[in-house]
Amino acid sequence: MHILSRVGQKLYFLISLVLVFNTGVSAQDTIKRPLEKALEAMRSGYWYEAKQLAEADGKVARDIILWHEFRSGRGSPTELREFLQRNQDWPGLPYLKEKGEQVFFESSRNEILSWFDENPPISPSAATIYADALLEAGKTNKAELIVQDKWISEVMDSDLQTVYLRKYDVALSQLHDERSIELLWRDAFEALDDLIPLLSDDYKKLVKAVVALRKYKKDGVNTLINRVPETLRNHPVLNFARFKWRLKYGYDDRAFQLLYELSEKKEYLGRPEIWGATREKLARQLLWDGDYKASYRVLSGHFVEDAKLKARLEWLAGFIALRKLKDPNSALDHFQNFIEIVESPISIGRGFYWLGRAHEDLNNLESARRAYDRASENYTTYYGQLALEKLGRSLPYDIMDPNIKLQWRNAEFIQSTVFQAAILMLAAEENGLAERFLTHLSENLSEHNLLKLESFLSELDDPHIQIRFGKRQARMGIIVFDSYFALHDMADYQWVVPVDLLLSVARRESEFDQYAKSSAGALGLMQVMPSTAQEMAKNLKIPFEEESLVTSWKYNVLLGATYLQELSYRYRGNPILIAASYNAGPSNADKWIQHLGSPLDRKTNLVDWVEMIPFRETRNYVMRVTESLTLYKTLVLGKEIDHEFSEFLGSSAYFSFTPQSE
């Protein structure tokens, strides 16, 4: 059995213990666990049989089937209530509750009222059954408020929108204009088609103008805009459509002028977050084109409140101010704003490093040192390692010492049904689900219990689950090193490129999940595209077997390593270029070299080079891979790294390898 063979003797006791605790049946008594059979039945659509089969593995196993059932919009109201009472700490409950609303569609009025009085409807379709029940109970005002709220805030398909109009026409009659604005912001053109006849004359004109602009029609748009009454001529949704249209057709100066004027007040923008995403893309393009003043001004007055987007805008404004406009005072403000928003070690390290750079440019050397010191605390990150270099320090030698392993068998979380469900799923060969439950379990544990859980994961020895756990903790500001930089069995073998490179790429590509499949078609541990894998197999003179890219991690790593070897040769072993080309392709890497210079050229500012990569995914990828290289090198070699990080980034560290085909 795959899972038990992987876990081996180290966890055989645990699986037997938990299964005996739940079912009274030893793990030795059967080859295939009842839950495994139940999940097979469930995926074939036999829900009742699945629940019956799961019962042989205990109540928690049956709840696993119920968890899936409710998330599929099936089940009964009674079972849903009882499940949530038992399992208030299970993962994915918001989604489960939203999908679970469907079980009330054929329920009695009392059942509907009992549920939705305590759990306000999430979906607009559920709002209709709740409103109907309220109307039957004589609670007209509350019913109208429920449907009115959904009407002005939700996009619906044509059928549901028709239901709303038929059932609640009086309650909604004064809200059609307001709904049209929501639909315009969300480009919900199909829903707007049905709504237009119900709009006031003024809003009909507004909608027609905005839709024409958002569909980038050339002919007649000025006529449509001129028909919009003066009271709506400066509506934010119309101005956003005009802004996007002008950019589309090359009227950049007019687009920028409109943006600058509207950025004076938040209310002029209407929805700053929607403008903000366009600001970031536009600022990046202007930065690439060398128009630094315009790039910076585009980011000014954004009024964005969404934390992730605001952080990106503030950091980018700070970078442009410092590195391109030579304005460290303005940069300080932006980097401070960035630091106040972010929480993860990656972002904290980044923020304080650049704060230090701004202070350094202002000759505030003590302030710079303090900022670098704060950044260096996050030494597992790209900017943390650059900050260490600024301070003249090396990576802490103790990263080679494993975390203290605590006895986990007496941990409080052993009694948690979340943990027990994870163990049952491991025994049923459902590692992906087990990982989800284990990482969710970690979110509310004390630091002491986190270390106990880490000890369990270390004994489990599934690097994919360890990495997922480590990353989840890192996002919460906690580094559990042994999991965050878990080692895969590939470290025990010799490859055509150094194993630290393979570990770093695989950690980023698949998080050590050998069964990973991307939406683009990349497969396995190294996320190799089948066409690339076929070419590498041909170079190696071995058969190409696409299925083996997933079923055999060694085959996958062999072909991925061969491709990395070719990239190493092409880019003279440079870590930045190897990572960038593996993620975005050699053609893009070549374009960036032509535009930005080569990281191998000593005149090139390496830190700026990485930050100037046009693709956010690739910028992040390069940082995550290169930060891992020195850490994995330290872990694998068992000795301190004697080079500076920036020296390594600009080096030909992986150039001592020539392609097999040569």
Residue ranges and their predicted role:
Residues 60, 67-69, 81-86, 249-254, ...:
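Catalytic glycan-binding domains that act on GlcNAc-containing polysaccharides
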Residues 37, 64, 69, 100, ...:
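Structural register within alpha-helical repeat arrays
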Residues 51-60, 71-74, 82-91, 104-105, ...:
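Solenoid-like repeat scaffolds
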Residues 10-22:
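Bacterial N-terminal signal peptides
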Residues 44, 137, 186, 215, ...:
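Structural motif corresponding to the intra-repeat A-B loop/turn of tetratricopeptide repeats
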Residues 70-73, 101, 108, 138, ...:
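Short coil/turn linking the two alpha-helices of tandem helical-hairpin repeats
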Residues 41, 104, 134, 183, ...:
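Residue at a conserved register position within TPR or TPR-like alpha-solenoid repeats
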